[in-house]
Amino acid sequence: MGKRLISQRRGRGTPTYRSASHRFKGKIKYRAYDSIESEGSLKGKVVDIMHDPGRTAPVARVKFENGEERLILAPEALMLNEEVECGVKARVKPGNSLPLSEIPEGTPIYNIENRPGDGGKLVRSSGTYASLITHDADKAVIELPSGELKALNPQCRATVGVVAGGGRREKPFLKAGKKYHALRAKGKKSVTVRGVAMNAVDHPHGGGNRQHPGRPTTVSRHAPPGRKVGSIAARRTGKRR
């Protein structure tokens, strides 16, 4: 009997293939939108800036005046002991979070809520930002890093500034081991071995005196998991002519 495929082992979810979430610093979410934020602003102080293995951007720990502690995505140029604010009366300054209706047009923003109160879903990778194009009483239009224009509720919150850690993709990994550990922290595969390069016990396409599948590579949609590799339920194969 052959061995299970990597896709089968990953699906089982053993520790080998799980992300080490116990090392992550925590969730990045805006605080509940209460009367403090809807009528004024709440100030806090940055007490720590940390690296989070599960993210590409640095994370800052903020202690607010009311005793709450929250993790936020650090913007560029944020420093320890710097003051940040959240609420409708907060200043338009990097690190401060406000509703889109209170942010001037053309301002770079990040960690944007998709729906009011969801805590922030859009534009959270290092070095990224969106631009607020326009807003009125009914909707706010932002330009995402991809260039797509998206209309949102003007009560959705966002943080002013650019996410710290820019230029990350310009620095090469140089070594396969560095790439392995970077992806391993998030539970991702670092390398993909071809089936024809494996032994017959490891993959349906493995074995033989040369590298070839040895059988048709198209398989049924209803094939069992150990045989479901190659072109799954393909309508056609080969070059388009």
From Swiss-Prot:
Part of the 50S ribosomal subunit. Forms a bridge to the 30S subunit in the 70S ribosome. Gene3D superfamilies: 2.30.30.30, Nucleic acid-binding proteins, Ribosomal protein L2, domain 3. One of its GO terms (cellular component) is cytosolic large ribosomal subunit. Residues 1-21, 200-241 are annotated as: Disordered. Residues 1-12 have a biased composition (Basic residues). The gene is rpl2. It comes from Methanothermobacter thermautotrophicus (strain ATCC 29096 / DSM 1053 / JCM 10044 / NBRC 100330 / Delta H). This is Large ribosomal subunit protein uL2. PANTHER family: LARGE RIBOSOMAL SUBUNIT PROTEIN UL2 (PTHR13691:SF16), RIBOSOMAL PROTEIN L2 (PTHR13691). InterPro entries: NA-bd_OB-fold (IPR012340), Rib_uL2_dom2 (IPR014722), Ribosomal_uL2 (IPR002171), Ribosomal_uL2_arc_euk (IPR023672), Ribosomal_uL2_C (IPR022669), Ribosomal_uL2_dom3 (IPR014726), Ribosomal_uL2_RNA-bd_dom (IPR022666), Translation_prot_SH3-like_sf (IPR008991). Pfam families: Ribosomal_L2, Ribosomal_L2_C. Keywords: Ribonucleoprotein, Ribosomal protein, RNA-binding, rRNA-binding.
